[in-house]
Amino acid sequence: MDNVLARPADICCLKGSFHSGDATGSTIQIDGIDTYVAKPHPDKSNGNVLLFFPDAFGLHINSFLMMDAFAECGYLTLGVDYFLGDPVTKHSLTPLSDPNFDFESWKNKHLKASEDAAARWVKAVKAQYGSSEDVRFACVGYCWGARFVCQQLSADAPIFFSVPSTDKLFEPEQRSRTIEILTENNKQFNMQVFANVGHGFASRARLTDPYEKWAKEATFKSFVDWFDFWMEKK
């Protein structure tokens, strides 16, 4: 039986670039967990809530800018600090080349702890923001955060994957098996695969590379289109 098809976080989760820009959201606490809140303009709000599960760098500028962009598309976007103040960026801004950063130790500390924090946070978010019958929830996860989408998403809800063609954490055989399982169980899904980009491209692409920048932006647009379509259908 296939319990988990994607492999645990590895050194590839530390690759990529930091982006620049001005974050427009704010940070609050939900059940004692730091949460970045990006609010849509009232004229653009669709009344839906998007839960954002960040990569190993946690609540950092790349995540802030993406959450702000989702808010621009109408979604009240909430990002969780499931590392509880201890993301990779607390230890190093250059973790791949920093001899003082022990990734394996950091990973082992947070694999289970981040799951517990995420589950607690999601429960609190639903209690705080889901009191109205009109509120609908969607979720998006990058790198470290992708598994939380699978854990928190309803078994019957549509799911969208955007992945690189070469990824040691989600190899072609695993992608194919994922498609087989979803198809066998008559689940609604879509998967887009990008060549010549690395793990984490959707959140940490090199924006100086036109193709990587396009792949990142195409992924964002696909996510928004997917949310808009399925949230409208409910």
Swiss-Prot record:
It comes from the Eukaryota. Pfam families: DLH (PF01738). Pathway: Xenobiotic degradation. It is an enzyme of class 3 (hydrolase). One of its GO terms (molecular function) is hydrolase activity. Its EC number is 3.1.1.-. Induction: Expression is induced in response to 2-benzoxasolinone (BOA) exposure. PANTHER family: DIENELACTONE HYDROLASE, PROTEIN AIM2. Belongs to the dienelactone hydrolase family. Fusarium verticillioides possesses 2 unlinked loci, FDB1 and FDB2, necessary for detoxification of antimicrobial compounds produced by maize, including 2-benzoxazolinone (BOA). The FDB2 cluster arose as a duplication of the FDB1 cluster with rearrangement and expansion by incorporating additional genes. Dienlactone hydrolase; part of the Fusarium detoxification of benzoxazolinone cluster 2 (FDB2) involved in the degradation of benzoxazolinones produced by the host plant. Maize, wheat, and rye produce the 2 benzoxazinone phytoanticipins 2,4-dihy-droxy-7-methoxy-1,4-benzoxazin-3-one (DIMBOA) and 2,4-dihydroxy-1,4-benzoxazin-3-one (DIBOA) that, due to their inherent instability once released, spontaneously degrade to the more stable corresponding benzoxazolinones, 6-methoxy-2-benzoxazolinone (MBOA) and 2-benzoxazolinone (BOA), respectively. This is Dienlactone hydrolase 2. It comes from Gibberella moniliformis (strain M3125 / FGSC 7600). The lineage of its organism: Eukaryota, Fungi, Dikarya, Ascomycota, Pezizomycotina. The gene is DLH2.
